[in-house]
Each structure stands twice: as structure tokens, then as C-alpha cells.
Amino acid sequence: MHSGFGVYIHIPFCAKKCDYCAFATFTDRHQLTTDYLAALRTHIKRSVASAMPRATSVFIGGGTPTLVPAAELMSVLAEIPLAEGCEVTVECNPDDITLEMMQTYRAGGVNRISIGVQSTVDHVLKSLGRTHNPENVQRSVSCVREAGFETFNLDIIYGAAGETLDDWSRTLRDVVALDPPHV
């Protein structure tokens, strides 16, 4: 019997490469998305046929999973056998989050969202190479909550180039004010 089996699905596509990111990502190969997702589904089906255990956790990260149409991303998730109580997380860019996307994720079995906030200070976001603005963070959290997610986290980064202690304090205050279950 397996005590736990985690699955990580990497979506390597990004609108822009963040300056701090060391992951394998591409900003110029979005035309490969359909083929990449088909390859993922094929690989998962073969793994299941070879006695892949039920997943106790699934994390869909990147890259930027939210660049992939939500229904297509859920078609990949649907191939994974899930254990009862499995935590299924999708990493999300605040620029991309919509209520419809979050509702599609919920209906597809996602039960946790990870929002890449990084900072709520404009010049810090720019130094990190992020494209969203602080206002998108509040809107994103509202969409996540409205879609019924009780579990979500806000990722933040400390020590970005040019970030002051006041900037960091502002980000912490802003994030705490949003009352996320996890940071």
C-alpha cells in the first residue's frame, strides 16, 4: 500500500519570463500547447495502465497554467486517478484569473488555488518582471472566493531588487488584509 503519491504537472508556457524564474518555461511556443496537453494525457494514461497509484496530491504549476484554457487543463486532470481527499492545486497568475476560470477549475476537481502575488508594490513587481498590478490581486482573490474555494494561498517573495523594508511591510499588510488561508 502506498502512503502517498504526489503528481506534479508542469505547464511550461508563459506570457513573459519572470526575472527570478529558473524553471523550464517558454514565451514563444504557445502553438505547442495542444500537442503538449495531448502528450501529457497520453503519458498519464500509460502510467495508469502500468499501475500508477491514486494521487494523494496534484500540483499543476509552471510556467503559467492559467494561460491554458481551463477546460483543456481540466481534461488533463481528469486522466489522473485521485485518492479520496486528494489536494489538487493550480498555480495562477493574477492577470489571468476570472470567475469563469475558477468555476471551471472547481467543477473539474481543483480544490486549492495558489496565486502568484509576489508583492503588492508596483516597482517591486516590475523589478521581478511580473506583469500584474496590485489591483489584480484583490480581484483575483474575490474570484477565487466567489467560485467557492475555501483553500487558497498567496505566494509572496521577500528581498527583491530595490525592495525596501517599507515595501515589504506594505505587502505583508495588504496580504493579511485579504485574509488568505495560507501564505
Question: PLM features: residue spans?
Answer:
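Flexible, acidic/Gly-rich N-terminal and inter-domain linker regions that tether
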Residues: 1-5, 15, 42
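N-terminal [4Fe-4S]-dependent radical SAM core
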Residues: 1-8, 51-54
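Structural motif
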Residues: 4-6, 18, 87
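Residues at the beta-strand->loop junction immediately N-terminal to the Walker
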Residues: 8-10, 61-62
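Local cysteine-cluster metal-coordination motifs and their immediate loop/turn environment
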Residues: 10-25
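Conserved non-cysteine loop/helix-boundary elements of the Radical SAM core domain that shape
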Residues: 25-183
